[in-house]
Amino acid sequence: YEKSGYQSARLMLLSDNIPEVLVCANDNMAIGAMKALRQEGLKIPDDIAVTGFDGTEMSELMGLTTVDIPDYERGYLAAQFLLQNIAGSCSFDTFKIAAKVHWRKTTR
C-alpha cells in the first residue's frame, strides 16, 4: 500500500491544484504519500495536511493523523453483513461505527 500511496501522490503533484488536505484510504498509503510530498519539498502540514485511516502503530510512530475504528467492531459488522447476505436477508441500512480521530503532527 505504501507504494501505491507514493505513486498516487506523485501523480497528484503533476497537477496545478494541490489540495489543502490529502485523505488517504489507509495509514500505509498516507505514509507513502508523505514520502512523495516531502521529496517534492512540501512541508506537512504547512503546505498540505495528510490523514490516514486505520490507527496503526506505524501511524503513531510517524506522527500521522488517523481515524481509528476498533478491529473487533469492524470485523463483527462485516461478519454480520456476510451472514445476512448468505441468508438472503441482507439489508443496506445505514449503521454507525465508533471511530476515534488521533490528531497528530500531519494536520493543524
For the regions a protein language model found, what residue spans apply to each?
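An amphipathic, basic-hydrophobic alpha-helix
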Residues: 5-8
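Flexible loop/turn connectors
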Residues: 10, 14-108
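Short beta->alpha junction loops
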Residues: 1-3
